[in-house]
Amino acid sequence: MYGIEYTTVLTFLISVILLNYVLKSLTRIMDFIIYRFLLIIVILSPFLNAQNYGINLPITGSMDTPYTNSTREEVFLTSTLCLYYPTEAATEINDNSWKDTLSQLFCTKGWPTGSIYFKDYTNIASFSVDPQLYCDYNLVLMKYDATLQLDMSELADLLLNEWLCNPMDITLYYYQQTDEANKWISMGSSCTIKVCPLNTQTLGIGCLTTDTNTFEEVATAEKLVITDVVDGVNHKLNVTTNTCTIRNCKKLGPRENVAVIQVGGSDILDITADPTTAPQTERMMRVNWKKWWQVFYTIVDYVNQIVQAMSKRSRSLNSAAFYYRI
């Protein structure tokens, strides 16, 4: 009886020892394989040139700085392009498949189907209130209207440049613009802006700080206003804050993933006269207009030349980015 128990215990111990030996052998074999594999990777890594998708690139300085992809594929094979156009274009074309047609035409220029996005807007005024530019490259078509030249110029200035903005509390504080790059940008359904310049004693210059009727009116019932006043002078402001938001903004530099294309018009809009626009922008262009099909054909034909004057952004943005640069 005791012999059977001893045999059972001995068998169990031998089994444990054998299992331990097998596990240690497997561990040594796996270590050998892993270390050999890592050694091969270390030896070959200087000769490999591939994209590392695991790196989160830091955004410092200008957000328009392009990061070069080490694999250097053609830009249109890995990018998205947004085309913004007035709704009247789709109304005139009157073809349910016109976007598919254009997508196939863009494909002949190297842009794969699915990389082109079409976004319509009602008019310049409504687009300026909530511009959303989400693609790697954004082309904004603006049909020329002699009555909206100022709105078009201000919208182009807003889209083609990057702004760092902060809120303004006009009920408590006076504000001044420090230099030419410092502007006050207002957006809303109806923006009426009045200003009263102040002297060193905070008394109004040509106006009474207690009477807004004596303030100089610089904008009336507009949806987008970029206000420029005399630098280095304090101002008291009066703004229709119930329908408008005003921000204190600094122009940082070009927003290089956006191009504005003026459609038609005898006069050519130009924002390069602004001394803060440096270098002179090449991303504001004009095409002739007869029919919208002709306009889109022209865009397709020259899309790659247009993109060459632009730089791909590192992330998307919406109208909030014009107020807060994060």
Curated annotation (Swiss-Prot):
Describe PTMs of this protein.
N-glycosylated.
Location of the region described as GPR motif in the Swiss-Prot/TrEMBL record: 253-255
Q: Which InterPro entries match?
A: VP7, VP7_1, VP7_2
Q: Which UniProt keywords apply?
A: Calcium, Capsid protein, Disulfide bond, Glycoprotein, Host endoplasmic reticulum, Host-virus interaction, Metal-binding, Outer capsid protein, Signal, T=13 icosahedral capsid protein, Virion
User: Which coarse location class applies to the principal site listed for this UniProt protein?
Assistant: virion
Asked whether the UniProt record includes Calcium among its keywords, one would answer yes
Gene3D superfamilies named in the record = Glycoprotein VP7, domain 1 (3.40.50.11130), Rotavirus outer-layer protein VP7, domain 2 (2.60.120.800)
Signal peptide start-end: 1-50
Positions binding Ca(2+) 2 in this chain are: 177, 228-229, 231, 301
What disulfide bonds does the UniProt entry report for this chain?
Answer: 82-135, 165-249, 191-244, 196-207
Q: Cite the residue spans of the region called CNP motif.
A: 165-167
List, alphabetically, the GO terms of the cellular component aspect: host cell endoplasmic reticulum lumen; T=13 icosahedral viral capsid; viral outer capsid
- Sites binding Ca(2+) 1 sit at 95, 206, 214, 216
Write out the GO MF terms: metal ion binding
Glycan-bearing residues: 69, 238
A Pfam family annotated for this chain is VP7
Where is this protein localized, as stated in its record? Answer: Virion; Host endoplasmic reticulum lumen
> Which family would the database say this protein is a member of?
Belongs to the rotavirus VP7 family.
How this chain assembles, per its entry, is: Homotrimer; disulfide-linked. 2 Ca(2+) ions bound at each subunit interface in the trimer hold the trimer together. Interacts with the intermediate capsid protein VP6. Interacts with the outer capsid protein VP5*.
HAMAP family the record matches:
Rota_VP7 (MF_04130), Rota_VP7_A (MF_04131)
What role is this protein assigned? Calcium-binding protein that interacts with rotavirus cell receptors once the initial attachment by VP4 has been achieved. Rotavirus attachment and entry into the host cell probably involves multiple sequential contacts between the outer capsid proteins VP4 and VP7, and the cell receptors. Following entry into the host cell, low intracellular or intravesicular Ca(2+) concentration probably causes the calcium-stabilized VP7 trimers to dissociate from the virion. This step is probably necessary for the membrane-disrupting entry step and the release of VP4, which is locked onto the virion by VP7.
Q: What else is known?
A: Some rotavirus strains are neuraminidase-sensitive and require sialic acid to attach to the cell surface. Some rotavirus strains are integrin-dependent. Some rotavirus strains depend on ganglioside for their entry into the host cell. Hsp70 also seems to be involved in the entry of some strains. In group A rotaviruses, VP7 defines the G serotype.
Protein's name in the database: Outer capsid glycoprotein VP7
